[in-house]
Amino acid sequence: MKRIYLLVVGLYLLSFSRAEEGLNFPTYDGKDRVVSLSEKNLKQVLKRYDLLCLYYHEPVSSDKVAQKQFQLKEIVLELVAQVLEHKNIGFVMVDSRKEAKLAKRLGFSEEGSLYVLKGGRTIEFDGEFAADVLVEFLLDLIEDPVEIVNNKLEVQAFERIEDQIKLLGFFKNEDSEYYKAFQEAAEHFQPYIKFFATFDKGVAKKLSLKMNEVGFYEPFMDEPSVIPNKPYTEEELVEFVKEHQRPTLRPLRPEDMFETWEDDLNGIHIVAFAEKSDPDGYEFLEILKQVARDNTDNPDLSILWIDPDDFPLLVAYWEKTFKIDLFKPQIGVVNVTDADSVWMEIPDDDDLPTAEELEDWIEDVLSGKINTEDDDNEDEDDDGDNDNDDDDDDDDNSDEDNDDSDDDDDDDE
């Protein structure tokens, strides 16, 4: 929310400053482009736009803070609608109370959610509610679900995408029934998972793919795994991706950060903080990659990598909540329910753990030897010790009072 406010204020101030041509940041022009969606105008709106961005919200209350928060989100949507006005994307809002029947018809249940209607699909946006993130998300959605790789330079560009899941298939041509099944499968995961295809034998040979074969690339892995039992139907591809879409090592991204955080293993995340642009952070990330590659067959291991540079407004919150210093690499286990956490002791930046030491620590986490409940017990023990100390103090004071009483009796005698 702070980011939204700063963004709006920053854009407002920029409107009063001079800028060279070609660097004029967009500022809200005051024109209303976001409309209220109802049963009456639903068909008309759906026919008009290729893509419909829908914000499903609770009724606006009389609370001033809640009103300001709603207004800020509305301004963000207006700015995004203005920037993408030429892209034939509609922007609407649905009041959960006024349009309860419509919400039920569309399958919306979670207030405060942002949905995108594309064809017959509904895609939920589960990322940071910020103008730049939303614009990038929507632009990715209007692109073709499959990107074609035809030459060596495009292969190099493909290979440089290392921090996200990607698939690449080799097909005869665009009319191939297996390519069409691949396209249909890609639509299920757009824009979160990238699908690529090639019709070039030279590209396929370089990537070690046979006809109608699809390679599945896990983030940060050296080699892909070939999906078995080719050729595939749409349903088979979708099922395989769903079964393997939790990588051994994955980044937290603004566009799907909440969905990723909710995708925990038994209520916990193994979280690693490392700045890729920092030498120590880069070194630590390379160690994490090695650990992930050595343990990619372990279904119980999933490490969530967070680059603090991607979330500047959350750094102070994370440091306070987890009681850690994010100016140096960190790795810990976090309980997603109450944010309790336990962190590996890293003495200093010059003494980062080796891959073997990290693996030993992770094994202790997976076995339950290291867990956040132990941290709670230690806190309770500390509280108990403090209580006992207080009791001891009370006993001492009581003894002193008794001694004073005896002295008084002697004086009376």
UniProtKB/Swiss-Prot annotation:
Any one of the GO BP annotations: protein polymerization
Modification note: Phosphorylation in the C-terminus, probably by CK2, moderately increases calcium buffering capacity.
Short name of one Pfam family: Calsequestrin
Subcellular localization: Sarcoplasmic reticulum lumen
Signal sequence range: 1-19
Cross-referenced InterPro entries: Calsequestrin (IPR001393), Calsequestrin_C (IPR041860), Calsequestrin_CS (IPR018233), Calsequestrin_middle_dom (IPR041858), Calsequestrin_N (IPR041859), Thioredoxin-like_sf (IPR036249)
SUPFAM superfamilies the record matches: Thioredoxin-like
Modified residues (Phosphotyrosine): 282
Residues with glycosylation annotation: 335
Any GO MF annotation of the entry: protein homodimerization activity
Residues with PTM Phosphoserine: 398, 405
UniProt keyword Ligase present: no
Feature: compositional bias, Acidic residues: 373-413
Record keywords, A-Z: Calcium, Glycoprotein, Metal-binding, Muscle protein, Phosphoprotein, Sarcoplasmic reticulum, Signal
Chief site of localization: other
Source domain of life: Eukaryota
Function: Calsequestrin is a high-capacity, moderate affinity, calcium-binding protein and thus acts as an internal calcium store in muscle. Calcium ions are bound by clusters of acidic residues at the protein surface, especially at the interface between subunits. Can bind around 60 Ca(2+) ions. Regulates the release of lumenal Ca(2+) via the calcium release channel RYR2; this plays an important role in triggering muscle contraction. Plays a role in excitation-contraction coupling in the heart and in regulating the rate of heart beats.
Family to which the UniProt record says this protein belongs: Belongs to the calsequestrin family.
UniProt subunit comment: Monomer, homodimer and homooligomer. Mostly monomeric in the absence of calcium. Forms higher oligomers in a calcium-dependent manner. Dimers associate to form tetramers, that then form linear homomer chains. Interacts with ASPH and TRDN.
Protein name: Calsequestrin-2
